[in-house]
């Protein structure tokens, strides 16, 4: 005799008769409560654009950071639970630094994503906290430039990650994704990608778009001291954002 749905909910590793993990599905729904983020791969590099949602006028706006630096050549943005994202971002940063200290070269974007996916697959599980573990309620976009060129990976709460040309996560991801499908092409420049990302955010955000409630990072290819191809993580200034937003 089958258990009720609520009983299948109790264990993160218990499949329902239909082959579903309800706790993972709930974690994916939590992602849809987060603010919208967009990643776009272009012919000149890759960029991340994220909505910074302030819940109070008393909050210090600069304290909200939706795009984190993993390493010189990799950035990551997220949608979902902030506390969960911090755990995963910290894992990515540690993995990147350990790789640098061990091999004296920069880690690939895919390898960083894989290491975080491995943690997500465990649902934060270990022997001590096994009874309290749950899936991470966060989706992430890893963007960077390595020896293989510009890369953009989408990671969801199930631990699945996919190589993308463009991707949106968060509350308005469905509308943003449709716009990306209609407007994206492989010959995009960074400037065109930036304008596209901000135009889409302007369309899907509930608040009026301005440089205070959006954050953009660009990662362009360069070379390191030994002449090896690598990326350079750069935050787009408020002045540049205002110029592009005004032109929309």
Curated annotation (Swiss-Prot):
Record's subunit section: The 26S proteasome consists of a 20S proteasome core and two 19S regulatory subunits. The 20S proteasome core is composed of 28 subunits that are arranged in four stacked rings, resulting in a barrel-shaped structure. The two end rings are each formed by seven alpha subunits, and the two central rings are each formed by seven beta subunits. The catalytic chamber with the active sites is on the inside of the barrel.
InterPro entries found in the cross-reference section: Ntn_hydrolases_N, Proteasome_alpha, Proteasome_alpha-type, Proteasome_alpha_type_5, Proteasome_asu_N, Proteasome_sua/b
BP term (GO), one: proteasome-mediated ubiquitin-dependent protein catabolic process
Protein name (database record): Proteasome subunit alpha type-5
The keyword Nucleotide-binding appears for this protein: no
NCBIfam families tied to this protein: PRK03996.1
Keyword list, A-Z: Cytoplasm, Nucleus, Proteasome
Taxonomic lineage of the native organism: Eukaryota, Metazoa, Ecdysozoa, Nematoda, Chromadorea
Gene that this polypeptide is encoded by: pas-5
Family: Belongs to the peptidase T1A family.
Compartments (UniProt record): Cytoplasm; Nucleus
Primary site of residence: cytoplasm
Top-level taxon in the UniProt lineage: Eukaryota
Organism name: Caenorhabditis elegans
PANTHER family tied to this protein: PROTEASOME SUBUNIT ALPHA/BETA
Entry-linked Pfam families: Proteasome, Proteasome_A_N
Physiological role: The proteasome is a multicatalytic proteinase complex which is characterized by its ability to cleave peptides with Arg, Phe, Tyr, Leu, and Glu adjacent to the leaving group at neutral or slightly basic pH. The proteasome has an ATP-dependent proteolytic activity.
GO-annotated cellular components: cytoplasm; nucleus; proteasome core complex, alpha-subunit complex
């Amino acid at each position: 005799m089958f258990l009720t749905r609520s009983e299948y909910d109790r264990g993160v590793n218990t499949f329902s008769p239909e082959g579903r993990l309800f706790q993972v599905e709930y974690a994916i729904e939590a992602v849809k409560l987060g603010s919208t983020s967009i990643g776009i791969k272009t012919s000149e590099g890759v960029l991340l654009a994220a909505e910074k949602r302030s819940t109070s006028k008393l909050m210090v706006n600069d304290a909200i950071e939706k795009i984190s630096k993993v390493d010189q050549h990799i950035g990551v943005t997220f949608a979902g639970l902030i506390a969960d994202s911090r755990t995963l971002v910290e894992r990515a940063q540690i993995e990147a630094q350990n790789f640098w200290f061990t091999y004296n070269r920069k880690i690939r974007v895919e390898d960083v994503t894989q290491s975080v996916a491995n943690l997500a697959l465990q649902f934060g599980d270990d022997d001590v906290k096994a009874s309290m573990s749950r899936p991470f309620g966060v989706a992430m976009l890893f963007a960077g430039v390595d020896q293989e060129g510009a890369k953009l990976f989408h990671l969801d709460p199930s631990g699945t990650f996919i190589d993308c040309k463009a991707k949106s996560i968060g509350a308005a991801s469905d509308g943003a994704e449709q716009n990306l499908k209609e407007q994206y092409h492989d010959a995009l420049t960074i400037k065109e990608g930036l304008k596209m990302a901000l135009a889409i955010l302007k369309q899907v955000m509930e608040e009026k778009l301005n440089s205070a409630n959006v954050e953009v990072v660009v990662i362009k290819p360069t070379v390191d001291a030994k002449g090896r191809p690598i990326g350079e993580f750069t935050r787009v200034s408020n002045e540049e954002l205002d110029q592009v937003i005004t032109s929309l």
